[in-house]
Design a protein with these regions (language model features):
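C-terminal outer-membrane beta-barrel translocator/porin domains of Gram-negative envelope proteins
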Residues: 1, 127-201
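Gram-negative/organellar outer-membrane beta-barrel architecture
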Residues: 1-131
């Protein structure tokens, strides 16, 4: 697969303290990421994000493969469109706390297995979610870290859905990354990073 990446960034697009960015990937699998953020410093900041991701892939999708002995793989077509609005506040430029609303559309289909010449649809639903996050970054450098802490904690609650398959149940997911770095004897640096997550339903 091949693609061309195009990026556009602009400060002060609508107001003096905003930042707009758009990443667009043109190719076999079209994708984009759009971000708009109004940074009010220690006051409440706000923004929006929008993304589109589409791809085709050969997959050993067990529910289909197990029911069709003559099929070893299916050609899966997957589309994810996500839109978010959020609010954020910061403390000392190193600690950020935010929350927002999300609308996500997921469509997954295959033409490998058809019924009456109609493609099989695994999902074609809209999901409505709320999310929150906490970020702490006291690392002294971006790449070659010698000291500091990092915490990136995220929580998302899938509240409701248009429920194409009539089997949706509300659930929540939490995940996080925690890191630590320290330097000993001026030249030896120890850095560790841990990730974890779980689902509640």
């Amino acid at each position: 697969k091949s693609g061309i990446l195009a990026n556009y960034s602009k400060k002060n697009l609508l107001v003096n303290n905003d930042l707009f960015s758009l990443d667009l990937i043109l190719g076999d699998n079209l994708r984009y990421n759009l971000n708009y953020f109004v940074d009010n410093g220690f006051y409440i900041s706000y923004g929006l994000r929008s993304s589109y991701n589409h791809f085709r892939a050969n997959s050993k999708f067990k529910p289909i493969v197990s029911q069709n002995p003559n099929v070893s793989k299916i050609n899966l077509q997957y589309t994810d469109i996500t839109n978010q609005i959020f609010f954020q506040t910061t403390f000392s430029r190193k600690f950020a706390l935010g929350a927002g609303l999300e609308q996500k559309h997921i469509e997954a289909t295959t033409e490998t297995v058809q019924i009456n010449n109609v493609e099989t649809v695994f999902d074609n639903s809209n999901y409505y979610n709320v999310f929150g996050y906490l970020k702490l970054d006291t690392y002294d450098q971006k790449y070659f870290v010698t000291k500091g802490f990092l915490a990136d904690l995220n929580f998302k609650w899938y509240v409701s859905s248009s429920d194409y398959n009539n089997n949706f149940k509300s659930f929540a997911q939490a995940k996080g990354t925690i890191g630590f770095a320290a330097t000993f004897w001026d030249k030896l640096t120890f850095q560790t990073t841990h990730e974890a997550g779980f689902t509640l339903n």
